């Protein structure tokens, strides 16, 4: 039985960077990365300065390891796809440290 989690996380410096240009890329990246781990996105909302996700994570995966994977890989994939982001964020840090999580 999977557990449902509401997760919220933000870009570094809470920059309002998630706009039309990057929304579709992030959506595709999140869906691809989640499918690799067997995580189901029940609902997701990309806001200009943060991301809300309702996900179902298999019990064998901890929330912290999943979030490290999701934020780490999505940052690398965004920098590969949109090289201009490196100038805004430098050092390949797209997401801010930490996240909010609650069981549903």
What are these regions (language model features)?
Residues 1-104:
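Basic nucleic-acid-binding interfaces
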């Amino acid at each position: 039985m999977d557990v449902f989690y509401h997760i919220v996380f933000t870009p570094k410096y809470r920059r309002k960077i998630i706009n039309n240009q990057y929304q579709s890329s992030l959506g595709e990246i999140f869906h691809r990365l989640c499918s690799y781990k067997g995580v189901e996105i029940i609902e997701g909302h990309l806001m200009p300065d943060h991301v809300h996700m309702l996900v179902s994570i298999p019990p064998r995966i901890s929330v912290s390891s999943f979030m490290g994977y999701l934020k780490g890989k999505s940052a690398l994939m965004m920098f590969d796809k949109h090289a201009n982001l490196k100038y805004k964020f430098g050092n390949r840090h797209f997401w801010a440290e930490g996240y909010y999580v609650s069981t549903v």
